[in-house]
């Protein structure tokens, strides 16, 4: 499945290079018009990251996200700075299909597990930003990559499998925003090891060949942000390469 994505800072569509707020590119685009274009080209799920909220949870762009949800017919998943159950409930109430939880799953797993129990495993996607070291260990980073987490991907997945983890978005940090291609070996391994989890691949997608490689890795979906914004290819072309299941 093709999952077009936009990142938002102060209401503007942006891209960061490897998660660095000092390496920001701003695009002169309307967020809603951009997402409606992706929807019109056949996307069935859209991914929105509130980078302002990720940096400062008090400045979450909830009003904008409500406007986006209202202006779209397809499902949206939203992440960025979600720290409390009130915020989860609010996003679900304004029409968000799935809430993306990152750092908090590492820092406060019991809290996040309680949300799986309350809202169901379809309502939450874990976002695991992974640093892979020279030994091949997959270490999950926290807080928008500004600090290391120290927990292995495998231990975190094992913990959340107990509450029915179904959706997980995995980014190899070294690839994000680089357009160097996805880490397909990682997704092949994850899909084989955890066949009951729908893995969303993210980071580094530059070409339709990259899209095909992720499709063949047996990931369930691929998040594409920068490549679409800079017109490397269109959503329509990506869906032709990997039809929505």
Curated annotation (Swiss-Prot):
* Enzyme Commission code(s) on record: 5.3.1.16
Which InterPro entries does the entry mention? Aldolase_TIM (IPR013785), His_biosynth (IPR006062), HisA_bact_arch (IPR006063), Isoase_HisA-like (IPR044524), Isoase_HisA-like_bact (IPR023016), RibuloseP-bd_barrel (IPR011060)
At the top level, the lineage of the source is Bacteria
Leader peptide range in chain numbering: none
- Which pathway is it part of? Amino-acid biosynthesis; L-histidine biosynthesis; L-histidine from 5-phospho-alpha-D-ribose 1-diphosphate: step 4/9
Please name the Pfam families in this protein's record: His_biosynth
Q: Tell me which stretches of the chain form a coiled coil.
A: none
Predominant localisation class? cytoplasm
Q: Provide the alphabetized UniProt keywords.
A: Amino-acid biosynthesis, Cytoplasm, Histidine biosynthesis, Isomerase
Does the keyword section mention Isomerase? yes
Q: Could you state a single Gene Ontology molecular function term? A: 1-(5-phosphoribosyl)-5-[(5-phosphoribosylamino)methylideneamino]imidazole-4-carboxamide isomerase activity
Reaction equation(s) it catalyzes: 1-(5-phospho-beta-D-ribosyl)-5-[(5-phospho-beta-D-ribosylamino)methylideneamino]imidazole-4-carboxamide = 5-[(5-phospho-1-deoxy-D-ribulos-1-ylimino)methylamino]-1-(5-phospho-beta-D-ribosyl)imidazole-4-carboxamide
- Give a yes or no for keyword Zinc in this entry: no
Q: Name one GO biological process term.
A: L-histidine biosynthetic process
A single Gene Ontology CC annotation of this entry is:
cytoplasm
The positions flagged as active site in the entry are 7 (proton acceptor), 129 (proton donor)
Cellular compartments annotated? Cytoplasm
Stored HAMAP family? HisA
What does the sequence similarity comment in the record state about its family? Belongs to the HisA/HisF family.
What is the name of the protein in this document?
A: 1-(5-phosphoribosyl)-5-[(5-phosphoribosylamino)methylideneamino] imidazole-4-carboxamide isomerase
- Origin organism of this chain? Shewanella frigidimarina (strain NCIMB 400)
